[in-house]
Curated annotation (Swiss-Prot):
This is Eukaryotic initiation factor 4A. ATP binds at residues 76-83. Residues 63-233 form the Helicase ATP-binding domain. One of its GO terms (biological process) is mRNA splicing, via spliceosome. Gene3D superfamilies: P-loop containing nucleotide triphosphate hydrolases. Belongs to the DEAD box helicase family. eIF4A subfamily. Its EC number is 3.6.4.13. SMART domains: DEXDc, HELICc. Keywords: ATP-binding, Cytoplasm, Helicase, Hydrolase, Initiation factor, Nucleotide-binding, Protein biosynthesis, RNA-binding. The gene is tifA. InterPro entries: DEAD/DEAH_box_helicase_dom, Helicase_ATP-bd, Helicase_C-like, P-loop_NTPase, RNA-helicase_DEAD-box_CS, RNA_helicase_DEAD_Q_motif.
Amino acid sequence: MSHKDRRGNSSNDGSSFKLNETFTSSEVEVKPTFESMGLREELLRGIFNYGFEKPSAIQQRAILPIIKGRDTIAQAQSGTGKTATFSIGALQCVEVNVRSPQVLILSPTRELAQQIQKVALALSEFMNIQVHACVGGKNLSDDVKKLETGVHIVSGTPGRVLDMITRKSLPTRHIKMMILDEADEMLSLGFQQQINDVYRYLPNGTQIVLVSATLTQDVVSMTEKFMTKPVRILLKRDELTLDGIKQFFVSVEKEDWKFGTLCDIYDSLTITQAVIFCNTKKKVDQLTEQMRDANFTVASMHGDMVQKEREEIIKSFRSGENRVLITTDILARGIDVQQVSLVINYDLPIDRENYIHRIGRSGRFGRKGVAINFVKNSDIRILRDIEQFYSTQIDEMPVNFASII
């Protein structure tokens, strides 16, 4: 056995850290440009072709440790460029002439796994690299066929990836890196055992990259199991709310008043695109029906819809065909919709840690955005808790809000 025992033990030589530690390892270099990272020429072309000019804060710090083969913990939330961070790191390490999976990326939802595939394919446009999305809701035989042709990177959900590995359709002997994206969400959804099982199939010494918006105790425990002397790139909590996003709340005395408030906001804004979050599938359906009855054009999406339908809805929203999308937290994790300028929390998130994921839909990469929270009298305590948790201030929305957005 090497330093990483397939039973899930790791002799990490004091590299574990406490939950409240929020620092970046002193060894982390800041690379101000992509050119200074020593990346392949064809990968650089893909990066610039994708529209990146200057690396974001997380990219400046995390790409180098990843391409140097270090186990890496990156605390980063939606809108920071984290997907491109680990995608660039993975693409730099792939040997193009080895037509077998070399990088495995696990994420909590099908949509996120497919989004990661799209980003990796776009960045590798000039590299002749095959990236496959291995997710549930699709025909097993399609996965088997694609994997048989030889792919370099697999982006998938833990259940389907484990299924493919146990069927011997996804060979693991050449895997050199496993990336765990949205690790906090994967654990909260109960994927811990499946991730452990996938890990046991990997070669000894596989590099682990873990990305998480929040470092819960479960995430910290996972790093201690899987990682050896990880490089840590951690942000202080008060840096977690994205710059450039104005946050407001609107007092609505009771639930019945929310709809009228939403209609008022809809009328007074020239919105590029907006996402409206509700806490339940039932509420999404009810609100969608109400909005359509009032002659507003809206789309809606939640987890009860079949995969194909969800993909069509995201596609039409991305293309701008639908301006307003009503959804549950299924969209709050990493679906990159560039034009979103407004997020409305019709319901405050049940889990305060989801607040950052929801408002991260707007203002991506420096684009300005607005988050509006509907707050019933009984929600005031939750709002204050969110403010305290993120060391941020959420102001009451002024009467002339349309002019300051």
